[in-house]
């Protein structure tokens, strides 16, 4: 890339599964999974909060499932690695509070007519607007800054759990700044400008050991060599000490990492969180179908970069609006792409749930609750499946 080209810097951050907010997301989604596994028609709005030695789950759940909420909380904390007060939370001895009520009957009748409606008649669970985004800068059709920050967080957890870096503790944050070139609306990454990792650690390790291990075992396997150069800046545990972490260090709450969950600051966000919500909540299902639409547009070669917005009214099945913007990278006009999108995708919440198979539990949603909901290579992430779009290339 010629030096004279105008470039800009863009930064995305991530947190790994031991961050207190992410712990809460995972507990909320583990509860959702347990409900859907027994009763696919479960209506779930499950929030979680945590602080030192305490986890509380609260919200509205209507289900035929028999769910042991306390057991789910403790198991989720244990699986992440919160097994003693030293690391930030003791899964077996912390206090667990449960305040779960039924879904409001007013909402229930408006959304699904107390289960009397056919799937295509099911109304949106609330009003709102959601966005999907895709870009051709990575194989995942996701922003590189976000992909790298997310993968660094996942790698931190991997080397903690497999014993490569035994000094690691569950909590940690990452941030990556990428230098980009704007090629007529498409984003072209040139190099990684800055890598920031702040990870919780035990008392035994020195800052020099932390920096050396992070470079060798976390950064090197994740960031392709072509993006690193002698000018790349590394901030590795720049605060100097991060022993106290998890809920002991900071309070946590479901739904506070919505940019990390999506596109790392690229595109746009309607503000609605995902975790702990069943598919009638369009905050979640609407964002999933919008991602599938945007990804399908880019995968089809219709555009190099794309954002899709949809909006809903509570109790109304059809979206109020659908919007497509290709940032000037479209091969045909955006209004024609919009027409193709409307013909290809069914944006009614009941049909989204069926077409994307969103009523299945197990550990399906728990997997989404750390390391991003999009750009993942996993069969359960059905919204990542590209739908073929029919269009004719304009004559040269």
Curated annotation (Swiss-Prot):
Principal localisation: cytoplasm
Tissues showing expression: Expressed in roots, stems and leaves (at protein level).
Example of a GO cellular component annotation carried by this entry: cytoplasm
Binding site for L-methionine: 60, 103, 250, 281
Cofactors named for this entry: Mn(2+); Mg(2+); Co(2+); K(+)
GO molecular-function term, one example from the UniProt record: metal ion binding
Keywords, comma-separated and alphabetical: ATP-binding, Cobalt, Cytoplasm, Magnesium, Metal-binding, Nucleotide-binding, One-carbon metabolism, Potassium, Transferase
Residues annotated as binding ATP: 19, 171-173, 239-242, 250, 256-257, 273, 277, 281
Catalysed conversion reaction: L-methionine + ATP + H2O = S-adenosyl-L-methionine + phosphate + diphosphate
Co-factor remark: Binds 2 divalent ions per subunit. The metal ions interact primarily with the substrate. Can utilize magnesium, manganese or cobalt (in vitro). Binds 1 potassium ion per subunit. The potassium ion interacts primarily with the substrate.
Quaternary context: Homotetramer.
PANTHER family, A to Z: S-ADENOSYLMETHIONINE SYNTHETASE
Family, similarity comment: Belongs to the AdoMet synthase family.
UniProt-recorded name of the protein: S-adenosylmethionine synthase 4
């Amino acid at each position: 890339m010629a030096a004279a080209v105008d470039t800009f810097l863009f930064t995305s951050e991530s947190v790994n599964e031991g961050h207190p907010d992410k712990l809460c997301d995972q507990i909320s989604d583990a509860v959702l999974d347990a409900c859907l596994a027994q009763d696919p028609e479960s209506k779930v709005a499950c929030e979680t909060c945590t602080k030192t030695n305490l986890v509380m789950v609260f919200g509205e759940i209507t289900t035929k499932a028999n769910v042991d909420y306390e057991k789910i909380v403790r198991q989720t904390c244990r699986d992440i690695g919160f097994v003693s007060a030293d690391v930030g939370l003791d899964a077996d001895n912390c206090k667990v509070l449960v305040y779960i009520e039924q879904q409001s009957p007013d909402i229930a009748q408006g959304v699904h007519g107390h289960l009397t409606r056919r799937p295509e008649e099911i109304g949106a669970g609330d009003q709102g607007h959601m966005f999907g985004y895709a870009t051709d800068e990575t194989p995942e059709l996701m922003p590189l800054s976000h992909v790298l920050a997310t993968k660094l967080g996942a790698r931190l957890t991997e080397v903690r759990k497999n014993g490569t870096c035994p000094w690691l503790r569950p909590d940690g944050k990452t941030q990556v700044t990428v230098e980009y070139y704007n090629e007529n609306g498409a984003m072209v990454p040139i190099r990684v400008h800055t890598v920031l990792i702040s990870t919780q650690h035990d008392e035994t390790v020195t800052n020099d050991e932390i920096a050396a291990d992070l470079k060798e075992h976390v950064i090197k396997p994740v960031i392709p060599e072509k993006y690193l150069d002698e000018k790349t800046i590394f901030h590795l545990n720049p605060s100097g000490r991060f022993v106290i972490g998890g809920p002991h260090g900071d309070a946590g709450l479901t739904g506070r990492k919505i940019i990390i969950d999506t596109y790392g600051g690229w595109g746009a966000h309607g503000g609605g969180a995902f975790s702990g919500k069943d598919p009638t909540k369009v905050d979640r299902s609407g964002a999933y179908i919008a991602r599938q639409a945007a990804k399908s547009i880019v995968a089809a070669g219709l555009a190099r970069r794309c954002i899709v917005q949809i909006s809903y009214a509570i109790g109304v099945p059809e979206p109020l609006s659908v919007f497509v913007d290709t940032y000037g990278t479209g091969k045909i006009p955006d209004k024609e792409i919009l027409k193709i999108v409307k013909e290809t995708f069914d944006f009614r919440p009941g049909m989204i749930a069926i077409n994307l198979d969103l009523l299945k539990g197990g550990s399906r949603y728990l997997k989404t609750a750390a390391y991003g909901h999009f750009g993942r290579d996993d069969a359960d992430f059905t919204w990542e499946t590209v739908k073929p779009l029919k269009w004719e290339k304009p004559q040269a």
